């Protein structure tokens, strides 16, 4: 997800899981408009794109969040000319394999679904996808279309988070959209969100 409340969904999920005692890493994989570094107060001069472009030590990527020892952050790094190529690289696959071996939860803050190439690439690398929708922004038909397209390429869709609903609002037909990707450990098959057609509530994974 990118920016605003979509971005906050990934961040809040990572923080909640880390507060529960799990080892968590969150990655900014929006290589076109990165924002995660700003939220956590990190420099973005070095990050994921440096690693994917040839710097092979993943330990240099991990930025500890001082206020929450269980949480590690990987910022995007400098914006590259070839985001899709980097995300589909063997280096990206190897990095996720390394992280899944060493962390209970790996949460990827992804580009908006409108950038479908990046979203599709990431969806094939992770255990599951969560759609984060914004009330009042785009049609539910469009959300369902993206959901179907991800399903067609074999992505496991955990469910949908709907943000931005006002208690006084009666207009539920239009939503914004973006995707978050979650990669829990292989030995933990419990999804963060139950599979639903529209909206679900978040469940803490076991462990």
Language-model regions: role of each:
Residues 1-207:
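P-loop NTP-binding module
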């Amino acid at each position: 997800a990118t920016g605003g409340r979509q971005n906050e969904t990934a961040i809040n999920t990572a923080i909640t899981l880390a507060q529960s005692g799990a080892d968590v890493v969150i990655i900014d994989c929006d290589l076109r408009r990165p924002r995660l570094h700003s939220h956590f107060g990190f420099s973005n001069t070095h990050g994921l794109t440096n690693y994917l472009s040839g710097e092979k030590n993943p330990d240099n990527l991990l930025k500890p969040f001082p206020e929450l020892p269980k949480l590690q952050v990987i910022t995007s790094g400098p914006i590259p000319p070839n985001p899709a190529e980097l995300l589909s690289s063997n280096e990206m696959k190897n990095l996720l394999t390394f992280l899944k071996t060493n962390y209970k939860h790996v949460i990827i803050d992804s580009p908006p679904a409108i950038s479908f190439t990046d979203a599709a690439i990431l969806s094939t690398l992770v255990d599951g996808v969560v759609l984060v929708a914004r009330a009042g922004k785009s049609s539910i038909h469009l959300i369902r279309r993206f959901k179907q397209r991800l399903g067609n390429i074999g992505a496991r869709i955990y469910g949908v988070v709907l943000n931005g609903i006002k208690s006084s609002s009666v207009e539920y037909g239009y939503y914004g959209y973006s995707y978050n990707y979650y990669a829990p450990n292989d030995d933990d098959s419990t999804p963060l969100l139950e599979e639903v057609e529209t909206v679900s509530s978040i469940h803490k994974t076991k462990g």
